[in-house]
Amino acid sequence: MRVTQLSSQSFIFPSPELALREPNGLLALGGDLTAPRLLAAYQRGIFPWFNPGEMILWWSPDPRAVLFPEDLHISRSMRRFIRHCPYRFTLNHAFADVISACATERDEGTWIGRDVQQAYCQLHALGHAHSLEVWLENELVGGLYGVAVGAVFCGESMFSRADNASKSALMVFCHHFTQHGGELIDCQVLNAHTASLGAVEIPRNFFLQQLSQLQFSPLPAECWLPQSLIFHPRCSKDQPFKTPHIRLYPPLAGRLILLKW
């Protein structure tokens, strides 16, 4: 099966069902990173991922890694840490700094080149891409960013420069996201870090069904306003975090070998 070459004159993508099995999820190549094309991709469960300086590649892997916010796994040590958390958290205060940090903090190299950073900063300016920042006093020590598609948040990357900074960021984001009606976080591809936090793999067709419904459930505008976030963990020494419920899915075929978050 051949990979589709995208037209520069159209934002139409091929069906995700046409994606390759190896490499898992490769669907199309070419095109550009303009805001209309990126939005068209995310609305169809497709995302860009490529090495800086090379041709743009578009992916829709099967299975798909997702995190249901209520299933976020919080270890005992993290529970203790968050009770006395030294950080403060903000939303959409320093998007460009967060994506730049995500690009520079990767020892194994990064897919977040300058063109990607500029493209997502444009999405942020248009109100579609968002960041959560973690501060220690006045220093940015952690954060994450991604793209909102209705009640789905497509997580792109996160970084940490201090103990538990990225984990704290995800905890605070999940709380804020669900408080405003968010239902699903797209992690795209599974890795050890996201799996340890509760991300799971589900069949692509199930993910696309969820996306097709939830993208038409926009969250209230105040969800994404620049703001400081205060997180009150739902636990104490005598009241643990709730136990995640178990979800069952059809059998999964194939495993991902890609790493992203």
UniProtKB/Swiss-Prot annotation:
Family (UniProt): Belongs to the L/F-transferase family.
Gene name for this UniProt entry: aat
Main enzyme class: transferase
Catalysis: reaction(s): N-terminal L-lysyl-[protein] + L-leucyl-tRNA(Leu) = N-terminal L-leucyl-L-lysyl-[protein] + tRNA(Leu) + H(+); N-terminal L-arginyl-[protein] + L-leucyl-tRNA(Leu) = N-terminal L-leucyl-L-arginyl-[protein] + tRNA(Leu) + H(+); L-phenylalanyl-tRNA(Phe) + an N-terminal L-alpha-aminoacyl-[protein] = an N-terminal L-phenylalanyl-L-alpha-aminoacyl-[protein] + tRNA(Phe)
Organism field: Yersinia pestis bv. Antiqua (strain Antiqua)
Name used for this protein in its record: Leucyl/phenylalanyl-tRNA--protein transferase
Function of the molecule: Functions in the N-end rule pathway of protein degradation where it conjugates Leu, Phe and, less efficiently, Met from aminoacyl-tRNAs to the N-termini of proteins containing an N-terminal arginine or lysine.
InterPro entries xrefs: Acyl_CoA_acyltransferase, Leu/Phe-tRNA_Trfase, Leu/Phe-tRNA_Trfase_C, Leu/Phe-tRNA_Trfase_N
SUPFAM superfamilies listed in its UniProt record: Acyl-CoA N-acyltransferases (Nat)
